[in-house]
Amino acid sequence: MSNEKNENDVEFESVGVVELPEARVIGLYGDVNEENSQEAIVSLLHLHYNRGSEVTDDGTVISLPIEFYVSTGGGMVAEMFAMYDLMRMVRKDCAIQTFGIGKVMSAGVLLLAAGTKGERRIGKNCRIMLHRVLTGDSGSLHSFQATYNEAEIVEEMMFRALADE
């Protein structure tokens, strides 16, 4: 992971989660794992509780949206659901515009779908891939059966969540 600066002297990491608070932008790049999900959750909460607003021509005050860019090969299910649940809560108060870039695979698909309806986009060359839940369990038959049962539950949760979006 390397830190870089752009011409506006904004520091960002080349892998992981990037937050540009003034622009209300979050980027999730790389695996959906504990570190990246924690950073994304903190960024979402920060932008949610420090939400900007603007006044329209008719005097209506509206919350500024959060832009959430996703490029991931997937990752951990628990962390995906943590981000997904938070995104659903946040979007009740302000729109979340999701943008799929590069590749959006596995756990990233649900995060892309968690954006506000009508505010989800993918790049022209973005690849989307969804697959059944994978397990890497080995050991006793009892252990394998428990893992298989859990995988079925998680898979059903994910497909139900996607259908709800």
Locations of regions flagged by a protein language model:
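Terminal-region recognition feature
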Residues: 1-165
